[in-house]
Amino acid sequence: MTGVGRRSFLRGALAGTGAAAVAGLPASADSATPAAVPFHGVHQAGVTTAQQKQAIFASFDVIAVGKHELTDLFRTLTDRARLLTAGGAPAPLGITAPPADSGVLGPDMPGDDLTVTVGVGASLFDERYGLEDRKPAKLTPMKEFPDDSLDESLCHGDLSLQLCASETDTVLHALRDVARHTRGAMQLRWRVDGFRSLPRPAGTPRNLMGFKDGIVQPAPADHDKLVWVGTGNGEPAWTEGGSYQVLRQIRMLVEFWDRVSVGEQENMFGRRRDSGAPLDGSTETDRPDYAADPTGTAIPLTSHIRRANPRTAETAASQFLRRGYNYDKGTDAVGDLDMGLLFCAYQQDIARQFEAVQTRLANEPLVDYIRPVGGGYFSVLPGVRDGDDHFGRSLLG
């Protein structure tokens, strides 16, 4: 590769990326394979989509120069997401060109329930792209809470990418493909690979503390008032159909947790470890009766479920949609296990929902066994409506 060609690849890749991305598309990108999640829609897939087993959460710093290159970046992300989620065989780029695909998934890429969900951070709305007056009304950098131990290198970012699918190689393939086609326009800031455990023995899957996680979720009928952003929420018109994403990398101090009695663990969560039932119930779907237990005899007043969701009329509006994944990073520098939960939540208003809940959880007993170390707040873009649309089109005007 010549010096000019190499520099074009590393720094100015976007000049021809849009055409290359389209050239790599199968003959019919919209003809989804049987295991494909539809890409086009009012909302992005990957928010209310049935949760897949594997995930990668990645945050990027955007290094594209000017609004034109930023637009090219969003067009490229759209082309790649449309291709990857549909599956099929990529068209060859030519006999002297590099292969159109890494080949990790074989000659015919399966759809594999892959979803690609794109969000933007508050830092994108600075003077670089002239978007200062386009920032979503409720988007801020992630707040640091009293019990956090945040590592700046694991926080924030201009752009978030959530990749979810049935198999690990599918999400890894998707990340590799996106990184290849956006090189020179954005660079990885931090990344967490997640997995969702099988229900054991049934019902909601468990986190790495052994407790069922994500039992209570907003009803689909409530998504318009709890999950999706609309023009009636004081937001810019371009955000309609989007959402707010909160990501939190929560390390679990499992060596210490495993020394705690089951009874004490259950009192901290407010649920039975075996069944997931609230401590005053018998099944995981039972609704705790706080009115009948005002002093916390059955479910301690300091328990996680009681503080997170007091189930009052005043706190009903703070519910959010959870879509978290377990993670395992091996060991840290001193040999301790580095594992935990990549907490992911979607909502209409971060302050009203996630931050209100997190404030209620301050100093709960569980904080001795968990350590939030990273994450970020992102505005999830509206969906790509059709083949002529692209991510960020309404934002960029």
Give the residues covered by each predicted segment.
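Long, histidine/aromatic-enriched segments associated with O2/redox biology
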Residues: 3, 8-25, 30-397
